Design a protein with these regions (language model features):
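Thiamine diphosphate
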Residues: 3-166
Length: 166
């Protein structure tokens, strides 16, 4: 568990797993904004689509906060939201299987963790040509943490797989 010994992180483990700069005294973000951004826009879009289409399934690999799905949003989706834990391979396989079964699937996934699912991207998704959408989040050469969370290998990796439009 993360956050041991820091009261705000112990009280709000999920929010502190991935956080913007904050005031150490109270754990509050240094900058707060009510402006829309890519995360809030993605969250709002997904929630709207879930309400419009009972066949929509949203999948996460233990990173729902990257597309704005905190506990409230996940509960609002009911059984239209599935978290496969830290298992991107399972996420891609679940995405393709559900799509082949008729579900409309969206699987937002972090770029930095996508290499874990290369075989499934190629063999489950591309070769099967399953109709699904996979927004890749956190792409780019800048990361809030360290080199392990840079998200720039997604482009050469995914574009090397025939049948996937990226």
């Amino acid at each position: 568990q993360k956050g041991e010994g820091y009261a705000p992180a112990e009280a709000h483990r999920e929010e502190f797993h991935f956080s913007a700069p904050y005031d150490v005294a109270d754990g509050e973000p240094l900058q707060q904004s009510n402006e829309s951004n890519y995360i809030t826009d993605t969250r709002d879009y997904l929630l709207r689509k879930v309400n419009e289409n009972p066949e929509l399934l949203i999948i996460s690999s233990a990173t729902p906060e990257v597309f704005g799905f905190m506990e409230k949003e996940r509960k609002a989706c009911g059984n239209q939201y599935v978290d496969v834990a830290i298992a991107e391979q399972t996420g891609v396989s679940t995405m393709t299987g559900a799509a082949r079964g008729g579900a409309k699937v969206i699987y937002p996934v972090m770029a930095t963790f996508l290499q874990r699912a290369y075989d499934q991207l190629e063999q489950d998704w591309a070769m099967d040509n399953s109709p699904a959408v996979m927004p890749v989040m956190g792409t780019g050469i800048r990361a809030l943490t360290d080199l392990t969370h840079l998200g720039f290998w997604d482009i050469p990796m995914i574009t090397s797989i025939p049948e996937i439009v990226y």
